[in-house]
Structure formats: structure tokens, C-alpha cells
Amino acid sequence: MSDFNIRKNPLKIIIVGPQKVGKTVIANSLSEFSHTISPDYHPTVGVRVLETEKDYTNEQVSNISILKKNKISKVKIELWDMSGDRRFESTWPAIKYGANGVIIVLDAVNDKYEGVIDEWMNNFCSEINPDNVTCFSYKKEDSKGIVKNKQSHQFPNMTIAEVNHSMESLLPNFHKFITKLLIQMK
């Protein structure tokens, strides 16, 4: 990441996880594309790229050396909303190329995704610093059941943020993640 030019290039964040866990809902909310959740499921075909910008205050910029050095307070971000369908697995190497960070999305109440964090980490994070990965455990509005404690066995220090259907905690957790990425950049 040392040769990354924040003035010319947007941060590339890939959003991965199993099918039907809410990756698109989260990507839409983060990009401010849509804050409404459709009751109909429409699977992502391959990948969708959404663009957004994050504004930083002068105080925040002074704490993030890459922003201070480049005299900028606005960061462009590309969110790569990936299909969880394994039939697109052949495209994954091209999609993950040049990624600055990864968001793994899991269903907060579904037991069938046990151990899935490590699987997605192995597929998408082999060339990325584990500190540049976060996980959102998403509880859909119609989800029944108790939120399961999700944890990576291989990466026990990875942040796992719980996000409910109202998305209240989504933006603060996303901004923490982006700030952490920017602080690590030189």
C-alpha cells in the first residue's frame, strides 16, 4: 500500500460474504445509494461498484498523515459489492486486485455460517494486512432468533461490528474502519 496515491485513486473496499446476508443492503447504505430495504431478493451478478466520498474535519485530517501530507479532506471510496455465489469464483482474483480493505458480511442469526469468516479471510485477505479487514454481522429486520457470537479462529483480533436493520451502527463502524485504513497508509 505504500505506493498508493490518495489524490488520484479511490480507496478500493471489497464487500464479501455468503449469499443472502445483506452485502448489497450494506453497500447501498454506505454509498448513500439507497436507505430503503427491498423486501424482494435480487442476487448480485458478479460484482457491482458503487462510489462515495468521506469528508474529514481539519482535526481528523491532522491525525491522519496521508491526508495532511496531500492537503485533502475528502476521500473517494469505491465499494465493490461482490456476489456470494461461488459460480463467480473465477473472477475473484481480478476483483480483489488492488483492494485496500475488505468488509466481510455475515448473517447475525444464522448458524450455517459458522467458520465462514476464516473461509472468506483465506479467499480474499491473503494479500491484505489482516488489520485492513473488518466484519459486519448484519441482523435483518425479519430475522428471528438470537444474534450468534461470530468470531474468526485464525484472526481473533478482527473487529466484528453488529449492524441491525435500522443501520444505526453501520456508518460509525464504517468510518472507524476507513480511518484505520488511512492511518496505516504513509
Name every feature range the model reports, one short phrase each.
Residues 1-186:
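TRAFAC-class small GTPase G-domain
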